[in-house]
Swiss-Prot record:
Keywords: Cytoplasm, FAD, Flavoprotein, NAD, tRNA processing. GO terms for cellular component: cytosol. NAD(+) binds at residues 273-287. NCBIfam families: mnmG_gidA. PROSITE patterns: GIDA_1, GIDA_2. It comes from Bacillus cereus (strain ZK / E33L). This is tRNA uridine 5-carboxymethylaminomethyl modification enzyme MnmG. NAD-binding protein involved in the addition of a carboxymethylaminomethyl (cmnm) group at the wobble position (U34) of certain tRNAs, forming tRNA-cmnm(5)s(2)U34.
Length: 629
């Protein structure tokens, strides 16, 4: 027998990385919010890699922070190591990566949630949604509690009909042997949602005391203080190294001999796995010309002996995993503490979502994270933040927020999902962003802080610091553009020392900085600023001046694209009435229901001829609309 358990503005189902961001954002925006999760001890749990960031993903964490989200602040307080990646490359692909103390990460984020006003955290399993007249009105739990809400956000991760697989062993489970969610998945199918079956995996964990680190290569963190959050002022300098080793020919032989026992190759696994995070079996088979593969040994925290064996994701049986580990240099006598496994789960086809992450089938229902077909904590957190923001906006009667591809990697991620869909777990890559020179690690605050403030997630104090930083950047750029550096002896000597060509005439300081061998610090030696500038301001000045031409070119591309984005398509347009559209294009347009000509042009199967026909049709005002009957 059910009972009325309360009424909320926003209900979030799940408390993983998507759910935490969704719940915190909604509550901080002023919505009365409830977070429901199967197990309170698993809030913000890291079931796979104990790390945050990396190429593209690290930029997403910066974007989450710039908008007022929590992931960046939380990892800054709880990491054991931090490194800037791709420092030898251009600014567009640089990214920060932190090794997490996964237990501290969980503890700190749960504490933040518990202390946040407007936010209630409760342990309970949601089995059904309350849906009336095509609108979501709340949820019903396994215990019969009925919670009503203006909006609901589903962030169930890999729990929907989750199954763990190792060799020929297969059983119903969420990650890390947690209770899976079976009934909710079945209920979503009843409501008419198309679901797909995806798979991901995790490697074994081993005991640090049984590793011979002398046979591995140390991978220390950066000496320079690093942080994801623009608010962080206290840095953790007591870092713990990771270690690099490699598989051996014996490892590969053992895998080859036992491929028939791998769930990946025996037919036990039906779900599609992540292309960019293959299992060790997959790597050995697909890249059989390579004599070895990298293995990183990553501590799971400061107060545990568990070490994550990065690069050894597997669905081989337990006995093979133990033998395989002991063929790796440094792990000859290792003790395995947890086995690796594959996990299959249900995800919804993401083209069933609007760019706000609201479902098209049911109003006021949003989804975020791995349920949308993505992989990765960062991708989940970015979606969770946007779903939470938009659910709160709907509940408060405010305009919803959609980030464009030119605004953020989060915008690229969501647009790819809702426009193109995905037939495998989606991972964000820098190559997916056509405006990646604009979407850098260093300028996330310049891109998104204004939006964060408008929606109420950025404090006035933080906004004031941001505007001061912006002003200092502009003033320093103007100063360098107005100063002429003459070919004095000390100038020529500095240029010679760094391998540059001597000056023939005077040159603007900004033009001298554009030379590839020149840095801001070199210019500062020649024409020092009277104002003390932070490293972040100096970095912005250098990048904006050095790459000005390329940035300008990208901005022109954005303006051309915006013309297409500004050509809106009515939501209720009847594509069947446009007889000259190709049949494939018509079906894809009906499935995705793009909101603009720009979005329509990115749908696979819709070619330029179809776009031209659609454009003419709309501009002539011949809009046949689908009947609401």
């Amino acid at each position: 027998m059910g009972y009325n358990a309360g009424s909320y503005d926003v209900i979030v189902i799940g408390a993983g990385h998507a759910g935490c961001e969704a719940g915190l954002a909604a509550a901080r925006m002023g919505s009365k919010t409830l977070m429901l999760t199967i197990n309170l001890d698993m809030v913000a749990f890291m079931p796979c890699n104990p790390s945050v960031g990396g190429p593209a993903k690290g930029i997403v964490v910066r974007e989450i922070d710039a908008l007022g989200g929590e992931m960046g602040r939380n990892i800054d307080k709880t990491h054991i190591q931090m490194r800037m990646l791709n420092t030898g490359k251009g600014p567009a692909v640089r990214a920060l990566r932190a090794q997490a103390d996964k237990f501290s990460y969980q503890h700190e984020l749960k504490k933040t949630i518990e202390e946040t006003p407007n936010l209630t955290l409760f342990q309970g399993m949601v089995e059904r949604l309350i849906v009336e007249d095509g609108e979501c009105k709340g949820v019903i739990t396994q215990a019969g509690a009925e919670y009503t809400a203006k909006t609901v956000v589903i962030t169930t991760g890999t729990f929907l009909r989750g199954e763990i697989i190792m060799g020929d062993l297969k059983y119903s489970s969420g990650p890390n042997n947690q209770q899976p969610s079976i009934t909710l998945s079945e209920h979503l199918e009843e409501l008419g949602f198309d679901l797909v079956r995806f798979k991901t995996g995790t490697p074994p964990r081993v005991n640090s005391n049984t590793i011979d680190y002398s046979k591995t290569e140390i991978q220390p963190g950066d000496d320079k203080p690093r942080a994801f959050s623009f608010e962080t002022t206290k840095f953790i300098m007591d870092q713990i190294p990771c270690w690099l080793t490699y598989t051996s020919t014996e490892t590969h032989r053992l895998i080859d001999e036992n491929l028939h026992r791998s769930a990946m190759y025996s037919g036990m696994i039906k779900g599609t796995g992540p292309r960019y995070c293959p299992s060790i079996e997959d790597k050995v088979v697909r890249f059989n010309d390579k004599p070895r593969h990298q293995i990183f040994l990553e501590p799971e925290g400061r107060n545990t002996q568990e070490v994550y064996v990065q690069g050894l994701s597997t669905s081989l049986p337990e006995d093979v995993q133990r033998d395989m580990l002991r063929t790796i240099p440094g792990l000859e006598n290792v003790e395995m503490m947890r086995t690796g496994y594959a996990i299959e789960y249900d995800a919804i086809v993401p083209t069933q979502l609007w760019p706000t992450l609201e479902t098209k089938k049911i109003k006021n229902l949003y989804t975020a994270g791995q349920i949308n077909g993505t992989s990765g904590y960062e991708e989940a957190a970015g979606q969770g933040l946007m779903a939470g923001i938009n659910a709160a906006c709907r509940s408060l009667g405010k305009k919803e927020v959609i980030l464009g591809r030119e605004d953020a990697y989060i915008g690229v991620l969501i647009d790819d999902l809702v426009t193109k869909g995905t037939n495998e777990p989606y991972r964000l890559l820098t190559s997916r962003a056509e405006y990646r020179l604009l979407l850098r690690h260093d300028n996330a605050d310049l891109r998104l802080t204004e939006i964060g403030r408008e929606i109420g997630l950025i404090t006035e104090e933080r906004y004031e610091r941001f505007t001061n930083k912006k002003l200092q950047i502009e003033q320093e750029k103007e100063r360098l553009s107005s100063i002429i550096i003459k070919p004095r002896p000390e100038v020529q000597e500095l240029i010679r020392n760094i391998g540059g060509s001597e000056l023939k005439d005077g040159i603007r300081a900004s033009d001298l900085l554009r030379r590839p061998e020149m840095t801001y610090e070199h210019i500062h030696l020649l024409v020092p600023s009277e104002v003390e500038l932070s490293d972040e301001v100096k970095e912005q000045v250098e990048i904006q001046i050095k790459y000005e031409g390329y940035i300008e070119k990208s901005l022109q591309q954005v303006e051309r694209m915006k013309k297409m984005e500004n050509k809106k398509i009515p939501v209720d347009i009847d594509y069947d009435a446009i007889s000259s559209l190709a049949s494939e294009a018509r079906q894809k347009l009906k499935d995705v229901r793009p909101l603009s000509m720009g979005q329509a042009s990115r749908i696979s199967g819709v070619n330029p001829a179809d776009i031209s026909i659609l454009l003419v049709y709309i501009e002539q005002g011949k809009i046949a609309r689908v009947s609401n009957q």
